[in-house]
Amino acid sequence: MSMKKTLKQVFAEEQCVLAPEVYDCVSVMAAERCGYKALCLSGAELTMSMKGVPDLGVMNVEELIWATDRICDYASIPIVVDAENGYGPALTAAYNCHRLAKAGAAGVIIVDSPEVRIGGESLPLEEAVGKYRACAEALKGTDCILVARTDVKTLDEAIERCVAYREAGADMTLVFMINDIPPKDRFEAAKKIAEKDKGWKWYPDLGAHNGKSDVTLEEIAPYGYNFVGIHYCLAAALTAMM
């Protein structure tokens, strides 16, 4: 087998990468055969596949690294791994990023949430910046990129955090609250983020309503959204089996 490309190499060739969110080697096989160029190992779908429960924080880092090693070893295309909040404070998260890169992750997503999360709050900005700085340092010298995901609830605060996280060393940012915006307004929100947050961006969970996509790749690619996730693999598999 030829060496798989890094995400940086894929981004140099593709303006916008549509990436299915996979959960095992079979879902990777299906995505590869469909011609996708990169993938995301979904924390939610991996939890459902391995444990049969929703994404409620029941996966631990050892289980994630075990799965990452096997799935990335099988895959012939790069995979970004959802590492939740890094499974601990800054130094722990940094060490876990290093371990995931060694296990084959082409990218690692770290969300700015605390270890104990009640009500969806995020870490204080200064603490989150410190965590991303530590994770970026841990990934230096590897081909693994750092994706900073913010779960704050307002667009203006999300933009502020994306700029700060990028300055701390994150290669890519992800604003999850785009999913909470009415579908007809999501493109304008994506544009507003891009005005201040320059660089690689991840558009979360591309969806459709009434048969029409909320946004198109052609619309968002010029604004720096070069990675777009889609959560359909597990749902498609369940539908086919039932």
What are these regions (language model features)?
Residues 2-203, 212-230, 236:
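Alpha/beta enzyme core
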Residues 209:
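Active-site beta-alpha connecting loops in nucleotide-dependent enzymes
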Residues 234-242:
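Structured C-terminal subdomain patch of bacterial secreted/periplasmic proteins
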